[in-house]
UniProtKB/Swiss-Prot annotation:
Record-listed ATP binding positions: 16, 175-177, 242-243, 251, 257-258, 274, 278
Assembly with partners or alone: Homotetramer; dimer of dimers.
Binding site for L-methionine: 57, 100, 251, 282
Main location: cytoplasm
SUPFAM superfamilies from the UniProt entry: S-adenosylmethionine synthetase
Protein residues bound to K(+): 44
EC top class, as a word: transferase
Gene symbol of the encoding locus: metK
GO molecular function: ATP binding; magnesium ion binding; methionine adenosyltransferase activity
Name this polypeptide is given: S-adenosylmethionine synthase
Family classification: Belongs to the AdoMet synthase family.
Enzyme Commission identifier(s): 2.5.1.6
Length: 397
């Protein structure tokens, strides 16, 4: 009998407490960047019953009405009812943002390369905002070059939100989670969905039978291709039996606690740094986007079935301390050729990444739910496939 393997990933909806925090942090970032594209921002958010706390460091010339940004974000997510224990116009909003540390700012504003040589190359000017390692990944098992388990998980909770907001399933509330287990064959190809778990917040009047029927028929079967579902696929719908209390009333939420949901669902490695609330001088965010951009173009070029790119930085230094490409034995050319092509074609200094991907724009709130990578519903620059031909030419040279 051929060997079959299972892999599981999860996602959470925009109404999950941690995702509320991420969206508030990125909404604040976007509001600041809209007025001051050169701002440095590190905005953290904590949410719990009836309260939102904003804290962190900002250097900017912009004035932003944080109170209004927070309330508008909460309202757009769908927390507009005091019964939920967390409502846009009644929550307490407590901002506590201070100026960025001058010790950090001096390394970001003037990199070690510039301080050491006096060189005025504009792309050498910005040093990395912190040390760290970042990963980007791509695989050919979905059209968006993402692992199937996390791709399906995102689409399930996004479908729940769409049905809630349209009123088609009127008893749904904003908080929800999904989890998908995919079975792979001996060649690491996905062959079926083994298990789907969905927990969705609901009004108290909704029955378990009604929720189960609607979620299976209107969500799961609408999202997951029929060829992946069979009579042995298991569905666990609200397995606790009741999910009325949810959102920040049920659990506190904090920016940066869903980093695996934000990326590849655990299918690829992660450097540990979160994204939301950070401007692009923070390589936790910008270098992760650059690494995804590189990996996706490598796979789309047919140079590997899957690719993982690692970048690493030292604080205050512009150039990465390391660049690695791992194709897990699937490459059609030597990995050293891929690494050489990456170094030649992609400027991986922070200022180079910012310029390459145009990251000073207010584009981040839309990434803060349903994944930062592999999105087909929004236009994100790190998802472009404009380096495919250049990569092919570089490895053939």
């Amino acid at each position: 009998m051929s060997e079959r393997k299972l892999f599981t990933s999860e996602s959470v909806s925009e109404g999950h407490p941690d995702k509320i925090a991420d969206q508030i942090s990125d909404a604040i970032l976007d509001a600041i960047l809209a007025e001051d594209p050169d701002a440095h921002v590190a905005a953290e958010t904590a949410v719990y019953t009836g309260s939102v706390h904003i804290f962190g460091e900002v250097s900017t010339t912009a004035y932003v009405d944080i109170n209004r940004v927070v309330r508008d974000t909460i309202a757009e997510i769908g927390y507009n009812n005091a019964e939920y224990g967390f409502a846009a116009e009644s929550v307490g909003v407590h901002p506590s943002l201070i100026e960025q540390s001058p010790d950090i700012a001096q390394g970001v504003n003037e990199s070690l390369e510039v301080r050491g040589t006096g060189d005025q190359d504009s792309l050498d000017l910005i040093g990395a905002g912190d040390q760290g390692l970042m990963f980007g990944f791509a695989i050919d098992e979905t059209p968006e070059f993402m692992p199937l388990p996390v791709s399906l998980s995102h689409k399930l909770v996004k479908k729940l939100a769409d049905l809630r907001k349209s009123g088609e399933i009127s008893y749904l509330r904003p908080d929800a989670k999904s989890q998908v287990t995919v079975e792979y064959d001996e060649n690491d190809q996905p062959v079926r969905v083994d298990t789907v778990v969905i927990s969705t917040q609901h009004d108290p009047e909704a029955t378990n039978d009604q929720i189960r029927h609607d979620v299976i028929e209107k969500v799961i079967k609408a999202v997951i291709p029929a060829e992946y579902l069979d009579e042995d696929t298991k569905f666990f719908i609200n397995p606790t039996g009741r999910f009325v209390i949810g959102g920040p009333q049920g659990d506190s939420g904090l920016t940066g606690r869903k980093i695996i949901v934000d990326t590849y669902g655990g299918y690829s490695r992660h450097g540990g740094g979160a994204f939301s609330g950070k401007d692009a001088t923070k390589v936790d965010r910008s270098a992760s986007y650059a690494a995804r951009y590189i990996a996706k173009n490598i796979v789309a070029a047919g140079l590997a079935r899957k690719a993982e790119v690692q970048l690493a930085y030292a604080i205050g230094v512009a150039n990465p301390v390391s660049v690695r490409v791992d194709t897990f034995g699937t490459a059609t050319v030597a990995e050293r050729k891929l690494e050489s092509a990456v170094r030649d074609l992609f400027d991986l200094r922070p200022a180079g990444i910012i310029q390459m991907l145009d990251l000073k724009r207010p584009i981040y709130r839309q990434t803060a739910a349903y994944g930062h990578m592999g999105r087909t519903d929004v236009d994100l620059p790190w998802e472009k496939l404009d380096k495919v031909d250049a990569l092919k030419a570089a490895v053939e040279a």
